[in-house]
Swiss-Prot record:
Record-linked Pfam families: Pmp3
Record's protein name: UPF0057 membrane protein F47B7.1
Organism: Caenorhabditis elegans
Membrane topology: Multi-pass membrane protein
Family label: Belongs to the UPF0057 (PMP3) family.
Domain of life according to the entry: Eukaryota
Keywords from the UniProt entry: Membrane, Transmembrane, Transmembrane helix
Places the protein is found: Membrane
Transmembrane segments: 5-25, 37-57
Length: 59
């Protein structure tokens, strides 16, 4: 199983800029981006967890 460059970029962004990682993964500004922006303002760690879930574990 090879790790693609897109996945590496999304992982780095999910840790440092979670809303941007979700935006790039989804290719649009959807509800998950808005939820993640709100999470970033109030709780940064849950925003990172949400971004990791959205980019890597969501089916």
């Amino acid at each position: 199983m090879a790790i693609e460059m897109q996945q590496i970029i999304e992982l780095i962004l999910a840790i440092f800029l979670p809303p941007l990682a979700i935006f790039i993964h989804g290719n649009d500004c959807n509800m998950h981006v808005a939820v993640n922006i709100i999470l970033c303002f109030f709780f940064f760690v849950p925003a990172v967890i949400h971004a990791l879930w959205y980019c890597f574990f969501r089916a």
